[in-house]
């Protein structure tokens, strides 16, 4: 079939890839003649739509494959791009990696949700208080971060009943308000039930921070341990009943297991949200009568490593009796925290590099040691123990070999208690009290330890036994083996192993004497030293300004009472 067109002739069937031929129409055509009183019927509408389609869309210009977007399966780059979402294995792996990073400790995604959603909603609905709303009662205690009182409300509220604990703090008060609000939203069962905190500037002594908690009891773990009846004096209040066991090591071990489980659970809640307490000790652990559990208090020294609140490099806040030997929760080379979004985004990397949560684990290990060994519950004996442990390079096994042959009755009884069930308690204790922070067990891993199982090692399955063996292997100290390998590799550089020392090799090497420094060289060195000093000064100034800005932004979250 021949088709004649103004540009020439084409023999064959019309190509479906080319547009339909447009029929010329005159001005008198019924399509273009329009009168307001005449309506277009359905056939005219269809013809008009078809004409527009052929004019703008249906006109094919180019080769058929270009118009139809067909391609070659061999050369896949010529295939048309898919408009839909294509799921690939690398894409799925990348998405899972990103999600795991965002939810890794201390939690980037939960942190943004907590700061910009939960905190905002909480400020809208939480009750507010003023200093005049309280009737101050007896003084409960006084610490390094403030004075604590037992108070009641001057005007009863319908939804606020009972007694409260009020703390007046001047130093680190803003930090403690921030930490308690974070803990209340993320892990309320780990610490005391925080209600409200505000800044009072009306005092003549200067700005004062007031913090309010619900009253849950006055008993601390330190006070309970000082009793000669410990741990039996805790049995009824923590378990609700007396065990059907005679007084002895097995019954005491059950009570201590329960206390340790609650302490590790509270500590795991803090660490999961990025908070390091840095001052864990029996005096900062209270017993909540309502929940019948131990809770951690006094967050004035805590550091929020999710956004860098209260973290200052080369500065430490601790109690030397319970502090880990490294004294710092992060490497001293770690710089000051940047802005909050950047700090939160980088927090999982810094957490895995430093493992700051192991600092608190060492303190919990010493508390475990005090509960098992009655003679270590006094401050003087604890200080003496720390000195002995330091002389033993913080190796509990070496300390045991040192003191066990001439141990007192209390020490021997403590060793018998931790040796129950195949020594599983001693194994947990040695995994907590270690010199190197990276070799210590985490709070989450400690909760899964067989020590907290009722049947101990006998209740482990095959997979649990394999995991336990892997854990024991990874907790071993391979420093001696590493030193032996390094010494073997450096064999040629030691005179002891038949090689030459570095000094001897330098003497055997022929070399020209060093040139004396001239005036030009000295001037250049002085200029470089001055440049480094200027750069260091500018950097420190910028850090101070940055610290000031950081203090301003998170202080704005604290309510004020003028």
Curated annotation (Swiss-Prot):
Domain Protein kinase, which positions?
134-452
Q: Provide the record's note on post-translational modification.
A: Phosphorylated.
Domain of life of the organism encoding this protein = Eukaryota
Q: Phosphoserine modification sites?
A: 526
Under the heading Pfam families, the entry gives: Pkinase (PF00069)
What EC number is given for this enzyme?
2.7.11.1
| Chain residues that bind ATP | 140-148, 167
Q: What cellular-component terms does GO give this entry?
A: chloroplast; chloroplast thylakoid membrane; thylakoid membrane
One GO molecular-function annotation for this sequence?
Answer: protein serine/threonine kinase activity
- Active site residues of this protein: 279 (proton acceptor)
SUPFAM superfamilies in the record, alphabetically?
Protein kinase-like (PK-like)
Keyword list, A-Z: ATP-binding, Chloroplast, Kinase, Membrane, Nucleotide-binding, Phosphoprotein, Plastid, Serine/threonine-protein kinase, Thylakoid, Transferase, Transit peptide
Annotated SMART domains: S_TKc
Family listed: Belongs to the protein kinase superfamily. Ser/Thr protein kinase family.
Q: What exactly does this protein do?
A: Serine/threonine protein kinase required for state transition by phosphorylating light-harvesting complex II outer antennae (LCHII). State transition plays a central role in response to environmental changes and allows to adjust to changing light conditions via the redistribution of light excitation energy between photosystem II (PSII) and photosystem I (PSI). Phosphorylates the minor light harvesting protein LHCB4.2/CP29 and is involved in the light-dependent phosphorylation of TSP9. Acts as a key component of the long-term response (LTR) signaling pathway.
What's the name of the protein?
Answer: Serine/threonine-protein kinase STN7, chloroplastic
- Species name: Arabidopsis thaliana
